[in-house]
Amino acid sequence: MTIEFSNFSFRYESLDKPTLKNINLRIEKGEKIVIIGPSGSGKSTLGQCLNGLIPHAIKGETSGTLTIYGQDTAPFDMHQYTEQVGTVLQDTDSQFVGLSIGEDIAFALENQLTSNIDMYPLVKATAKMVDLEQMLDRSPHDLSGGQKQRVSLAGILVDDVDILLFDEPLAALDPKTGKKTIEIIDDLHRETGKTIVIIEHRLEDVLHRSVDRIILMESGEIIADTTPDEILASPLLEDYGIREPLYISALKEAGCAIEGDAKPSSLTTLPLEQYKPTVQAWFDGSTAQPPKTPAETLLEVRGLTYSYDGEKNALEDVSFDIKRGEFVSVLGKNGSGKSTITKLIMGVIEADSGSMSMNGQDLNELTIFERSQKVGVVMQNPNHMISHHMIFDEVAFGLRNRGIKEKQIEAKVLEVLELCGLSKYRHWPIEALSYGQKKRVTIASILVLEPELLILDEPTAGQDYRNYTSMLSFIEKLNRELGVTVMIISHDMHLVLEYTTRSIVIADSKLVADAPMTQVFSSPELLDQANLTTTSLFDLATKVGIEDTNGFMQHFINVEKAHRQQKSGEVNQPEKAVA
């Protein structure tokens, strides 16, 4: 046995009620487990208890016991925790300590006073394990998201700990890089026999490689401790607002019964011949029509080129239009230039060449403040946007800057907080929120300004399925009923599939596609070029012999959209807060 929580509870110093309640969990040596649950369910808190951040960096009250290799951790100092558990954080930038990759990997060895003669081969061997041996002199801050993950992983592997804890390792990664990360974790697990604990929202992506168990948490309690096959065959994921794999959703929509003994945790192990007639009949009965594209142009981009360093172009001769009332996505791998487009539209940086106009007006003629009256941008990292201590004040900030009367501000802020599932937290300090809740605060602070063009940069990062569905269904309603134009910058294929109608694809700084979303998602070669992957919906259609993959995906989207609109009057239960 490696890890055991026995009747373990924890209450943050700043909260009245415990965040973890009577946890009983046993993890055997060499197991690979995944912990899932809604935002604020206690997943990350459990991880912080395991790696010693609680109680050493984060104060609170504990009861019960946590043992690692049979030793009670209560008397452990931080050094004793780090000898046993290595952690790769969701925000890898906050984990770097060295000026170069080599220095960062060597940090733990330097703390142990390892000689340079012994240190160099250890650093090089560890870097090779994660395919970084040719990059030891580069700065970790200059790397892509996937490369940063590998640097963080190398930094803990060099210390040869027995337990590896990954806190949402896929949150900021494009699909192909995410797959590679899961493969690296799985290879390490098989080759070293280390105990692996993964905390993650993206269950389908984690199940790219097999895991032993899935732990489902809600409200600080363990709801289920079972196998991947059993949880996918049960209603638990839907009941607790966890996003199930796309192929499972499609099979259920088609009327297929999913049983645990059918091994549903992988599309390759499912008895698809058994489901084939049912799926084909479901599709044959469809009348899927692609959505109509509005005619009026809101944003026109022509020949946009920009370089950060004057040498390599971050964007090169990019042209596209955004129609008024559209819901579009900009796709591409980490570092492809997607976020550069946002910065140029905002006016934070100026294009080297090319033009942008909105409602026929050249954006270069507008100040950043004037642009902000027309364009609202929700950044990927909520901590980069938040400037106030209290939630209400943060959401009201933009309206107060516009000189609106306080009575009107209060009414508008309360309306948006209610729509975003944050009304009950309006008098809370922002630091008492989870990462996902902070994300919703930033979205609320932009929505309250009623922009003509709303840009969401990776809106699902740190969000669970229930809450991002609630949020994006609300934005979808604004788009449908009020004509708000929405542009999502993302590499979350599931999100793009569910909500957007057209995809602008950027690869290596160039525009490689501007087409209906289902057409893009039916082009494996194009997706591969952009470091994206086909969805399991496309793979399912192919495996059951449906040639019109475009139509199959559109039918599924239409059915899902109809379900969302039926539920649009329902209020989703807001996530629980954590400090």
Curated annotation (Swiss-Prot):
Primary location class: membrane
Limits of the ABC transporter domain: 3-244, 299-533
Keywords, comma-separated and alphabetical: ATP-binding, Cell inner membrane, Cell membrane, Membrane, Nucleotide-binding, Repeat, Translocase, Transport
UniProt binding sites for ATP 1: G37, P38, S39, G40, S41, G42, K43, S44
Name of the featured protein: Putative ABC transporter ATP-binding protein VPA1482
Topology of the protein relative to the lipid bilayer: Peripheral membrane protein
Source organism superkingdom: Bacteria
Enzyme Commission identifier(s): 7.-.-.-
Function description: Probably part of an ABC transporter complex. Responsible for energy coupling to the transport system.
GO MF annotations in UniProt: ATP binding; ATP hydrolysis activity; ATPase-coupled transmembrane transporter activity
